[in-house]
Amino acid sequence: MTEVPWVEKYRPRKLSEIVNQEKALEQVRAWVEAWLHGNPPKKKALLLAGPPGVGKTTTVYALANEYGFEVIELNASDERTYEKIERYVQAAYTMDILGKRRKLIFLDEADNIEPSGAREIAKLIDKARNPIIMSANHYWEVPREIRNKAQIVEYKRLTQRDIIKALVRILKREGLEVPKEVLYEIAKRANGDLRAAVNDLQTVVTGGVEDAVEVLAYRDTEKSVFQALAQLFATDNAKRAKLAVLGVDMMPNELLQWIDENVPYVYYRPEDIARAYEALSRADIYLGRAQRTGNYGLWKYATDMMTAGVAVAGIKKKGFVKIYPPKTIKLLTESKEERSLRDSVIKKIMSEMHMAKLEAIETLRYLRVIFENNPDLAAHFVVFLDLSEKEVEFITGDKEKAKTIWAKSMNIEKKLKKEGELEARAKEAERRVEAAEEEETMEAGEPEEELEEVEEEELTEEELEEAEEEIETVGKKEKPEKEKTKKGKQATLFDFLKK
């Protein structure tokens, strides 16, 4: 029996082979043929939206096979920066001029595109000379700048009947038989995901139909990598360790990074840690060979080494072990809400502490340590930076600690508010005293003005005439003296000294 994954071996090569998506495929054909006839559609991008495992990626490659396109695939969760995306797209344009085959640009996981890159990708769509197809689980999570420029084609979730038919066709081509109840159980657990169902079918056949119930018991399409690793590290049984990761929708190289990150938290003896990393090293070698040679049958051996090999490496720590995401891909796995909270905290640090962005990012790392170890000091930072409760939880990474810090910050704010109210009252009292003193001063000054006015009113006409005559007499005496001074010789410094 071949080791090639059945999802690749039996991937449809024609659009007509895709399971129960006729309406969606009709729209896709019309859109592509408009490009081929030299009349590109008004919306130059196509957005395929629907649940996992319904045929979105398969549509792209079947389309390329039928119409002779060369696919240039990008993954939004891996190539998030605009510079990388632009480099690939510009390369596609260049190859279009020099090469003979037309290019089809495929952007997978478009709902994971960074907002900063979305605007630039929208510009690339505007000037596109080749068809651009994107895929997403939820079209409303695709950035608006891109979504508005794309024709949306919705794929429906497959029924259990659809999945069973597809599984039966594969079994016939393999010359195998599986009990109906097992097929029904696979279809039920797949929850509309044909890719997951095919993987389960191959696992059941490889492990033996008699173990099908045990194998399927581990299958959970919604299982997170945290749950899978918790099961993996909790057992020292090789078979259970391999079954633990069946429900994780993740490539082997990604899973390797997760396991690699958590080995030191699970094992405490140096020799056990060394054995675990030796198993991971062998897994990495198999993955590298599979990538270079295209022999993806090596994935099975890589998975065995990174699961069973690690699980039986030695004695594990007792009690609960927290699972940590890999540092190298942590930023890529953050949810949109987490990225938004992170950016918000960084902006507040930049504003309140007058820092550049890189300094603020570095400061955030120190804040995490403070929030982890010193709730009292952390509470003061919450007030100083005006952090929200969600931002506190983001920095802390622990809901219980976040609640404690938030409660302390509320007490500080109440205290500051009370002090502020007292200060405001004191200032108001001071203002009132000053106003009262000013009013008293004004009232004391009014009689003097009245007195002056009375004195001016008491002058008689005779006194006014005498004053005028006196002014005229003084003026006549001063005038000749001024004229005499003008006619005299100009005094010099020598004359002044002679005197």
From Swiss-Prot:
Residues annotated to bind ATP: G50, P51, P52, G53, V54, G55, K56, T57
Coiled-coil boundaries: none
Regions of compositional bias (Basic and acidic residues) in chain numbering: 473-484
Molecular functions per Gene Ontology: ATP binding; ATP hydrolysis activity; DNA clamp loader activity
Alphabetized InterPro entries for the sequence: AAA+_ATPase, ATPase_AAA_core, P-loop_NTPase, Rep_factor-C_lsu, RFC_lid
Stretches for region Disordered: 428-499
Protein name stated in the entry: Replication factor C large subunit
